[in-house]
Amino acid sequence: EDIGNAKVGFVLESGFNSDDGASGQGGRLFGREAQVNVSGAYGTLYAGRIASIVSDSGSIGYLGDVSAFPNAFGFVGSQAGSTGSAYGRYDTTLAYQPPVFSGLQAAVLYSFKADSKTDTTSRENSSFADRYAAAGLRYKAGKAAVVLAADYTMYSNATNPDLDDG
């Protein structure tokens, strides 16, 4: 939807197991991706449940450009196999991508609470909750692509909540 000099969009993506029809992603209705985004001259801001930059799927997954084992090959190439984190998709997330400049694109992502379905007791963005951050650069020129990405999981500290290890 155009709103002046910006556009607002959304993605609602659900998944199911093809062998038995059961809902995927822990029973979430839109467990694959559920985000709203605003884009304009300065890039795109995303909010919601999003796959990581260090992933080969989702709206901002950079590894799909360079993965020898894309997501279609199962766990080996899935987002859970390409990141050091316990999660492939992240709840309560903000992400930003500035515009592409001469084939170079950047992205940053921060999740205030990585998994709000299994972690129902902790506060967002506190030492009680698993938090996650990622950043990436992607360069594309014709059929060539180079990706540099990093991620960091700040695991919760339920035994000593006053100590914030992340």
Regions found by a protein language model. Name each.
Residues 1-113, 129, 138-145:
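Outer membrane beta-barrel
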Residues 3, 66, 72, 116, ...:
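Short linear motifs in intrinsically disordered/low-complexity regions
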Residues 22, 81, 118-123, 158-161:
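Extracellular loop and loop/strand-boundary signature of outer-membrane beta-barrel proteins
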Residues 56, 116, 155-159:
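Short acidic/glycine-rich loop or secondary-structure boundary segments that cap or lie
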Residues 128-166:
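Detector for outer-membrane/organellar transmembrane beta-barrel domains
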